[in-house]
């Protein structure tokens, strides 16, 4: 597909998204909606700057930004009226709303700070503008949760990139390398494979550190006879992937083998049982019940998964107290885990897309082989040299 054709397709998609958003705005009885979350601006307008405000009503589609991004916005968001503003909302929004005849303005309650909303409310009173601020959540996120074919294509490429990178990463995980060194090597692999940066800090957690679900790589040296949890992702054309595997250096002990098999069974059960129309807490229950029955329910302390798209964590959220409904077109992770404090943990994470009512697994990296050889990086180099010398002397 040529660049001009691809851009034309994306422009049509954004116009369609804007139409759906306007329907949602009308259904909520709002005159307009103010958006500031970067992923939502990108989704609706194509704007990639780090500072901007999108205002949408039945008649208006406005992208407001400061001097730094005006020219960029004109190039990326040609279907929107671009206005240059000061960065503080309260300095310009009340006057604009008054000029456009808006009286009920929705805003992203989970993204605008308390201080910003307070200053905006005070400015509305001071300027005697007839404007009611209405907190909203999830309006655009609901639209983003159903992936269009082009979006799914980008996500699939990001997943394939991580699959390929993991095969290379397994050669890095050896006794003697630190968690930080391994994480850096994995990041380099991801970038070399074509990832547009990384969507989150790579996790390499070994031994007891693998019992920390969101561990950060440390100076700890990876040793033989311990688990190593790897969590990484890639980004292609703005769309993310998310992936976890747990490896073991050498022959796994009985406890690790047990919890690994339980986690794998929990994940497989969830993948096979999840259906469109299912409540997300029911989806979580599919895996959680397996772990609870095995006696480890109290150490599976996070939800089963989360949506992935322009953000690495987005709607839907699959957890024991969530109540969203799954639908065809949603892309999300399935990542049960067991974490034994002071010993180690296991998490296995795949990405799936709901199609024809069932989950199709996007992630292809193997899960049934988790034990790695224990020779060190120095031994690995010596072994490769010996193999090379044997080939030369033949």
For every predicted segment, state its role:
Residues 1-390, 394:
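Active-site neighborhoods and metal-handling regions in enzymes and metal-associated proteins
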């Amino acid at each position: 597909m040529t660049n001009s054709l691809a851009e034309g397709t994306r422009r049509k998609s954004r116009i369609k998204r804007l139409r759906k958003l306007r329907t949602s705005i009308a259904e909520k009885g709002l005159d307009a909606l103010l958006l500031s979350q970067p992923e939502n601006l990108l989704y609706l307008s194509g704007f990639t700057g780090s500072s901007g405000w999108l205002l949408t009503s039945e008649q208006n589609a406005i992208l407001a930004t400061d001097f730094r991004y005006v020219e960029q916005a004109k190039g990326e968001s040609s279907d929107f009226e671009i206005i240059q503003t000061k960065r503080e909302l309260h300095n310009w929004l009340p006057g604009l709303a008054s000029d456009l005849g808006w009286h009920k303005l929705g805003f992203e309650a989970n993204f605008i700070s308390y201080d910003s909303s307070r200053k905006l409310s005070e400015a509305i009173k001071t300027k005697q503008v007839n404007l009611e601020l209405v907190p909203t959540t999830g309006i655009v996120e609901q639209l983003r949760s159903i992936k269009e074919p082009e979006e799914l294509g980008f996500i699939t490429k990001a997943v394939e990139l991580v699959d390929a990178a993991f095969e290379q990463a397994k050669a890095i995980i050896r006794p003697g390398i630190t968690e930080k060194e391994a994480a850096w090597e994995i990041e380099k692999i991801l970038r070399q494979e074509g990832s547009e940066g990384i969507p989150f800090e790579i996790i390499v957690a070994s031994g007891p550190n693998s019992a920390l679900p969101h561990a950060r790589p440390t100076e700890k040296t990876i040793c033989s006879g311990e688990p190593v949890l790897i969590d990484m992702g890639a980004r292609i054309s703005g769309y993310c992937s998310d992936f976890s595997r747990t490896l073991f250096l050498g022959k796994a002990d009985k406890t690790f083998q047990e919890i690994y098999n339980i986690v794998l069974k929990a994940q497989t059960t969830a993948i096979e049982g999840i259906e469109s129309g299912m409540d997300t807490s029911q989806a979580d229950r599919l895996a959680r019940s397996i772990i609870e029955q095995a006696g480890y329910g109290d150490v599976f302390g996070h939800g089963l998964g989360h949506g992935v798209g322009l953000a690495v964590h987005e709607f839907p959220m699959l957890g024991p107290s969530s109540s969203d409904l799954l639908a065809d077109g949603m892309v999300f992770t399935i990542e049960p885990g067991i974490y034994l404090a002071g010993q180690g943990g296991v998490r296995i994470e795949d990405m799936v897309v709901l199609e024809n009512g069932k989950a199709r697994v996007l992630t292809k990296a193997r899960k049934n082989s988790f034990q790695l050889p224990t020779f060190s990086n120095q031994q690995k180099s010596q072994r490769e040299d010996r193999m090379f010398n044997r080939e030369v002397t033949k």
